[in-house]
């Protein structure tokens, strides 16, 4: 067993690492959260840290005794918490209820008064499971490949949501004894993991979950019962059911399309006579996995790019650019096509093949492929484009 010093935000922490254990695993075990969209397989490049002042991928490093690890200070994303007003049907019920939106990437908790339905507090955060993979497939793989992995992921998310509800209660001057119910919605995999139910069946044909949560699971959080939103199928979860209910689309004649655009993308097409549903594993596309300088749409992300005698760009938060979010990536690719830096086959040209005015932005990588430099820190590679 070795000892490693971790530096974060001006503070230092000493953690222990097992023999042969990766730095990412040791950091997870010690309560530190690093983005690892690929689940620690060395593919996404998002778990980069400083090890003795050298930039390394935490999932590829087995630390030595005495190593000093510097973690990046990542800002949180802008998580939507505004929703349409919902008319209360609470009647004469008393006490409080918590509504939980358990997303693959983000978690939101909202506290209500049952009598009258008044909203008291909303808290949102990144899903702490993100360190174990950016999408539901990565999380399923973790539960299948890691001894006790399912219980570990369940414990992590239950502790996070319990803490978020507790903070909401404290902020409102309320006690835990006033909490009467918690209602939780999420995709089928997230609801299974929260309930510590096996998810292997969802990963293989015929993609059959353990339950669709049609009946209560006798689950409890903070001494209050947990009610799960019924799911539709293995990859169409309780979040779709709740969305169709709250939007009222199930009552409307004709055809409406309900979209849940997230890490696990789902859609439902239909109306008062029923819905057809489907899903797609969007994966961590919105978080920039697989793109060398990709990142989520948080402070420091280049969100828009255009060419007007030079490359101009907008940065979320107004600070120095750190990477490209999805909209910035699409803008940049379009601008490079217009400027002749990307050919009709999708190839990013090396400098000698590009228009003369573009050559100062281009270099070659170690394999001879073109690399475009928007700034010193932000680039786009040929592999990113293809």
Model feature map: region roles:
Residues 8-10, 52, 64-65, 113-116, ...:
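Short acidic-glycine loop/turn motifs at beta-strand connectors
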Residues 33-65:
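Local cysteine-cluster metal-coordination motifs and their immediate loop/turn environment
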Residues 53-100, 107:
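Fe-S ferredoxin-like electron-transfer domains
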Residues 72-89, 124-159:
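Phosphate-binding loop and its immediate beta->loop->alpha context
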Residues 91-130, 255-273:
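Gly/Thr-rich phosphate-binding beta-strand-loop-beta motif of the actin/hexokinase/Hsp70
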Residues 139-148, 152-156, 160-166, 191-195, ...:
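Helical "lid/coupling" subdomains associated with nucleotide-phosphate turnover
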Residues 161-180:
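Phosphate/pyrophosphate-binding loops at sites that engage ATP/ADP/AMP, CoA/4′-phosphopantetheine
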Residues 176-187, 333:
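Short glycine-rich phosphate-binding loop at a beta-alpha junction
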């Amino acid at each position: 067993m070795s000892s490693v010093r971790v530096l974060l935000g001006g503070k230092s922490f000493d953690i222990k690492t097992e023999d042969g254990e990766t730095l990412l695993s040791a950091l997870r075990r010690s309560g530190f959260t690093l983005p690892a969209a690929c689940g620690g397989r060395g593919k996404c490049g998002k778990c980069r840290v400083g090890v003795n002042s050298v930039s390394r991928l935490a999932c590829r490093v087995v630390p030595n005794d005495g190593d000093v690890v510097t973690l990046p200070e990542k800002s949180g994303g802008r998580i939507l918490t505004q929703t349409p007003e919902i008319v209360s049907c609470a009647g004469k019920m008393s006490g409080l209820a918590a509504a939980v939106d358990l997303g693959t990437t983000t978690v939101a908790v909202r506290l209500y008064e049952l009598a009258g339905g008044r909203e008291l507090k909303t808290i949102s955060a990144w899903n702490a499971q993100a360190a174990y993979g950016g999408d539901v497939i990565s999380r399923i793989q973790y539960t299948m490949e890691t001894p006790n992995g399912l219980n570990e992921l369940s414990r992590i998310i239950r502790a996070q949501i319990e803490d978020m509800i507790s903070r909401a209660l404290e902020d409102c001057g309320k006690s835990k004894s006033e909490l009467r119910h918690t209602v939780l919605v999420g995709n089928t995999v997230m609801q299974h993991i929260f309930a510590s139910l096996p998810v292997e069946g969802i990963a293989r044909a015929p993609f059959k979950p353990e339950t669709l949560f049609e009946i209560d699971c006798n689950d409890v959080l903070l001494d209050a019962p947990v009610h799960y939103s019924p799911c539709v199928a293995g990859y169409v979860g309780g979040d779709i059911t709740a969305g169709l209910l709250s939007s009222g689309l199930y009552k409307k004649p004709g055809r409406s399309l309900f979209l849940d655009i997230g890490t696990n993308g789902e859609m439902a097409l239909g109306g008062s006579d029923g819905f057809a549903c489907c899903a797609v594993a969007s994966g961590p596309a919105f978080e920039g996995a697989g793109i060398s300088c990709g990142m989520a749409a948080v402070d420091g992300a280049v969100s828009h790019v255009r060419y007007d005698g030079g490359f101009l760009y907008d940065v979320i938060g107004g600070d120095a650019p750190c990477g490209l979010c999805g909209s910035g990536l699409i803008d940049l690719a379009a601008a490079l096509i217009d400027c002749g830096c990307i050919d009709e086959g999708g190839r990013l040209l090396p400098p000698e093949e590009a228009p003369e005015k573009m050559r100062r932005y281009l270099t070659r990588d170690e394999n001879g492929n073109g690399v475009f430099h928007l700034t010193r820190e932000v680039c786009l590679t040929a592999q990113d484009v293809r």
